[in-house]
Amino acid sequence: MVLDREDVMKSPRLIAVLIVTIVLGVAGRANAQLKISDTETAKLYMSLATVGTAQALTQENVYNASGQKIAGLSPGMQTAFGDLGFLGKFGKHSEIEMYFDLYLASRNHPSQTYGDQGYLLIRGIPENLGQPRLLKAIFSKVDFKAGAFLVDFGDQESHRSNNAIVQQNPLVGNFVIDPNFVSVGVQLQSKPARYGWLVAATNGTNTEDFQSGRGNALNAKIYAYPIKPLRTSFSFYTVNHDETPAGTAGSRATLFSGNRSGERYGAVLGGGQAPGGVLPQAGKDVRAGQFDVTWDGASPIKLYGHIGQTMDKDTNGNAAGKPEESWRYYAADVVYRFTPAVYAAARYSAANALKLGNVDSNGKVDRIQFGGGLWLTKNMLMKVEYVTQKYRGFAEGDMVNNGIQAWRNPSFKGVVSEVSFAF
């Protein structure tokens, strides 16, 4: 059949069908960086990500520390976030990598650019150093990282949003307890393989810290692919800053008690740097472990889940007393791909308070998310999500995060949508 121009102009439905068919059949996630320089011994890449988010959320039973009820929320647009990253590969065989990235705009600093990661990764011996036998043997088995880098705890980083880097997250929001933390230190890791490991030592804070009594953090991970689509891992983290003052005046590890990369639900439950998220503990004497499992095979279904537990043995720091706080948390999500460009997703995540201020607790926070995404192009993703979250079971007087009274069973629910661009 041949259509002339008049036929086409009279058939907007046909045009719409053709456009949708092209989008659904061709679009899919891009895994590219822009190469901006390439020589025999140096390659430089740049990446850029930006995201705009709209929300229509409501909240109930939200009271601050003084007992005043916090007002409801209006629908609207969030601040647009942005990230800029640079990766350099040096040596004839790219033996050395240097990476740094900037938060151009973020929830913590919406109008200020500041650094996120910046590190050196050595994969082999540069040609200029010759081939020392011992070092060659070592770097044939391991890689070495040094600088400010994301502490490799758990596998959730492959399923969550990090400021404007959102396209690996099938939904809009993150997990209700969402461990993530950039710290300064060194890391030794095995070469990529079916089985692997890493160990790292950092200063246990997210910036330089030379306070007397500051501890040093250790973390480790082992992982395995028992069969090709299945990945399992176990992570461990420990640090002790309890010889420094309590609160922000002392050293603290914010793996759990802070979230610089932000949460996606603007102003809910008192707002802050991660609105809606549970930010447990003071980051003083912390021990944590997490088990992760991922299934990502040829089928249209992708599965991910984790379970973890974290405790702070002394939230007071060097003040009198040793109040303990501990939480258990878990999550599961499923993604179903209808085509390379269209998918649906659902996630359940929860946090159980085991002990608050040395008192056993039955408090629980549940978050349910479901939605989906459409790849408009290989670099643009549109997502929509419905979310509902509620606190329950906390004892009278229990407060969390920004002084929100958890015992009053605060909750929020509604719809969020975002459009992101990345290369």
Predicted regions and their residues:
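Sec/Tat signal peptide C-region and signal peptidase I cleavage site
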Residues: 26-32
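Outer membrane beta-barrel
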Residues: 34-58, 71-207, 212-241, 330-341, ...
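Short, glycine/charged-enriched secondary-structure capping and boundary segments
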Residues: 62-63, 159-162, 398-399
